[in-house]
Swiss-Prot record:
PROSITE patterns: RIBOSOMAL_S2_1 (PS00962). InterPro entries: Ribosomal_uS2 (IPR001865), Ribosomal_uS2_bac/mit/plastid (IPR005706), Ribosomal_uS2_CS (IPR018130), Ribosomal_uS2_flav_dom_sf (IPR023591). One of its GO terms (cellular component) is cytosolic small ribosomal subunit. The gene is rpsB. One of its GO terms (molecular function) is structural constituent of ribosome. GO terms for biological process: translation. It comes from the Bacteria. Residues 229-242 have a biased composition (Basic and acidic residues). SUPFAM superfamilies: Ribosomal protein S2 (SSF52313). Pfam families: Ribosomal_S2. Belongs to the universal ribosomal protein uS2 family. The keyword Ribonucleoprotein applies. This is Small ribosomal subunit protein uS2. Keywords: Ribonucleoprotein, Ribosomal protein.
């Protein structure tokens, strides 16, 4: 299992929180102290809590679940899109559309529209329309792609959400909580940890710190996927062995006992 070490966290500035005046008192248990007006996060706790979050991600994917990565702030967008794509998971890096999860049926209609437009441009069907209409459809497709591109293959709700900066992504947090979707989140000193199921106390503003955590969660997804495939392969192998095993011959029915020959009848001699 590829856990993140304290050395990696120190090198990427995970321990730097927000200014002391911009904090949520509920984060007090995860704060080591303050330096130059900046809260310093207790990395011993971060190391331990990251392992718990990592294992949750692995377990989710092992059991066939999918993870949605959410990070719409500028510092997180590239890392979230690249790493979620590498792991074969879903992601949202542009604006979080209200109802993305709680009104998923409507979102699916928009996804269907996006796929239809992509198909029209791919096979040339769009060329039947006038230039003005083509430009309108291009703008529509670009807009849908920006907001839904990372979830266009999501045909059901995810089983886990990984969020960078839950304070910023408060609408996504509310939707996950309403639907009972567990949340793993990089939680800075200005966040409310009570809203998060698996807190990773850490800097959610520094690009290097964000990349470290996002890549590690993507690795956890890949690890879970590999374990799931291995388990599936073993199950298939067991089924083949069972199918190939010779069936036990049915027990032979006991032959009926032979009847004893009848004793000859001796007639009494006449006197």
């Amino acid at each position: 299992m590829a856990y993140v070490s304290m050395k990696q966290m120190l090198e990427t500035g995970v321990h730097f929180g927000h200014q002391t005046r911009r904090w949520n008192p509920k984060m007090r248990p995860f704060i080591f102290g303050a330096r130059n007006g900046i809260h310093i996060i207790d990395l011993q706790q971060t190391v331990k809590l990251f392992r718990t979050a990592h294992d949750k991600v692995v377990d989710t994917v092992v059991n066939g679940g999918k993870v949605v990565f959410i990070g719409t702030k500028r510092q997180a967008q590239e890392a979230v899109a690249v790493e979620a794509g590498r792991a074969g998971q879903f992601y949202v890096t542009n604006r979080w559309m209200g109802g993305t999860l709680t009104n998923f049926t409507t979102i699916q209609k928009s996804i269907d529209r996006l796929k239809k437009l992509e198909a029209m441009f791919a096979d040339g069907t769009v060329n039947k329309y006038q230039k003005k209409e083509i430009l309108r459809m291009q703008r529509e497709m670009d807009k849908l792609l920006a907001t839904l591109g990372g979830i266009k293959e999501m045909d059901r709700l995810p089983q886990l959400a990984f969020i960078v900066d839950p304070h910023r992504e408060d609408i996504a947090v509310k939707e996950c909580r309403k639907l009972g979707i567990p949340i793993v989140a990089v939680t800075d000193t200005n966040c409310d940890p009570d809203l998060i199921d698996f807190v990773i106390p850490g800097n959610d503003d520094a690009i290097r710190a964000i990349k470290l955590f996002v890549a590690a969660i993507a690795d956890a997804c890949l690890e879970g996927d590999a374990m799931r495939k291995e388990r599936k392969g073993k199950d298939a192998e067991e089924e083949l062995k069972k199918a190939a095993a010779p069936k036990a011959a049915p027990a032979a029915e006991a032959a009926p006992a032979a009847e004893a020959p009848a004793a000859p009848v001796v007639e009494a001699a006449a006197e």
